[in-house]
């Protein structure tokens, strides 16, 4: 058994139903919330209210209605824990097609590989190779409701096969289904004193669906999927035909119960908190008011992302962003930088880089992310 197994066990520990004193909210398939494209990554891991791009399927499919192109495809690759291993990664492929000026459809496949694990129970045995992985397949339909506003609905299938069968015969692959509801507003070009501008806003309630069960044991624990609410807005300053600067802000909240049930030791002392075992719909509504410390802790469950994107001639881009999460809820804090290029043939290439500013090490720290897109006119 090699050292990679220890890394995999560390990653899979996120499925543990118990949370320690920080009361971090845990879910199954957390990779669903990881930014898979370099543009959004360069803007502080956000995209619900940015301008439309080929990866809008993940952030807000309603944006496709405002695309100037008829269809497009995109690919991305993100190494994970690249400082420790070289075969854990997140990959994504997305496609969209505008049926008309009022409607569009889109789809994507996201695949998260935890790499190959060689397991030896006896040094003389032939290694048994395990390949835990997770993937999702989704499709969306978007409809323009007015000149400036569109909404979309998405359906998603989730599969999580993270069992190590040779070590644990009581676990199995888990699956679920989910839906998303999103909306996007983009104003007309408005003239101001010395510049033009476009106002944008968006929301996305994603991964609304049943919990996942990994245990074969009857009555075994089920894990919530990461139902999530994104709210964002932004403004693009257009200084002339070649130069523009877009500012965007996004707020996120997980719509799953907080760890609020006390776990006691033999002396009756509180040693941890765990999530209540309730239905996923009840959990969504309960998530707005179940934190043990009341409204103050509910506010701490919000994450914030701020991004800047400078565009020259709509062909060269420089990006920067900041992401912040409260220490009690995970303490993810990082700065992101990125760049992008777009050719006359609508080929786009984007790169981003993450720099952690927290004591908590990010698995994506010092990782270069790459994404490619191509539009068809």
Segments (PLM) and residue ranges:
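Subset of outer-membrane beta-barrel
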Residues: 20-377
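Bacterial Sec-dependent N-terminal signal peptides
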Residues: 1-22, 308
């Amino acid at each position: 058994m090699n050292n990679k197994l220890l890394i995999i066990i560390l990653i899979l520990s996120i499925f543990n139903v118990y949370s320690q004193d920080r009361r971090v909210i845990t879910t199954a398939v957390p990779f669903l919330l990881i930014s898979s494209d370099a543009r959004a990554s360069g803007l502080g891991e956000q995209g619900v209210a940015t301008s439309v791009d080929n990866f809008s399927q993940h952030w807000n499919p309603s944006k496709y209605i405002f695309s100037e192109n008829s269809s497009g495809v995109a690919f991305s690759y993100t190494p994970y824990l690249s400082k420790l291993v070289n075969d854990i990664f997140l990959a994504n492929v997305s496609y969209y097609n505008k049926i008309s000026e009022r409607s569009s459809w889109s789809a994507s496949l996201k695949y998260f590989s935890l790499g190959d694990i060689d397991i030896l129970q006896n040094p003389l045995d032939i290694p048994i190779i395990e390949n835990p992985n997770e993937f999702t397949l989704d499709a969306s339909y978007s409809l323009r409701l007015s000149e400036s506003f569109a909404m979309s609905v998405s359906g998603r299938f989730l599969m999580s096969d993270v069992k190590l069968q040779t070590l644990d015969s009581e676990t199995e692959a888990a699956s679920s289904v989910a839906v998303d509801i999103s909306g996007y507003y983009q104003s007309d070009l408005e003239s101001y004193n010395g510049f033009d501008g476009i106002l944008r806003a968006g929301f996305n309630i994603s991964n609304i669906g049943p919990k996942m069960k990994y245990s074969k044991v009857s009555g075994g624990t089920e894990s919530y999927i990461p139902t999530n609410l994104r709210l964002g807005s932004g403004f693009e300053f257009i200084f002339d035909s070649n130069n523009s600067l877009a500012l965007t802000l996004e707020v996120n909240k997980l719509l799953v119960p907080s760890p609020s049930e006390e776990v006691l030791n033999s002396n009756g002392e509180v040693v941890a908190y765990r999530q209540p075992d309730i239905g996923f719909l009840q959990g969504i509504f309960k998530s707005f008011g179940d934190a043990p410390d009341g409204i103050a802790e509910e506010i701490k469950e919000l994450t914030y992302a701020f991004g800047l994107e400078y565009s020259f001639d709509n062909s060269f881009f420089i990006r920067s962003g900041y992401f912040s999460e409260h220490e009690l809820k995970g303490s993810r804090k990082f700065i992101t930088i990125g760049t992008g290029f777009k050719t006359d043939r609508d080929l786009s290439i984007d790169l981003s880089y993450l720099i952690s500013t927290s004591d908590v090490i990010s698995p994506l720290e010092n990782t270069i992310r790459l994404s490619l897109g191509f539009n068809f006119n």
